[in-house]
Structure formats: structure tokens, C-alpha cells
């Protein structure tokens, strides 16, 4: 889950 969360955050940060 953490991995998915980080991935989403990176996408949102973009």
C-alpha cells in the first residue's frame, strides 16, 4: 500500500 501511496503522491506532485 505504501508503494502505491508514494506513486500517487509523485503523480500528484507532477
UniProtKB/Swiss-Prot annotation:
EC number, UniProt record: 1.11.1.7
GO molecular function annotation: lactoperoxidase activity; metal ion binding
Domain of life according to the entry: Eukaryota
UniProt cofactor(s): Ca(2+); heme b
Keywords tagged on the record: Calcium, Heme, Hydrogen peroxide, Iron, Metal-binding, Oxidoreductase, Peroxidase
Keyword Heme: yes
Protein name (database record): Peroxidase 6
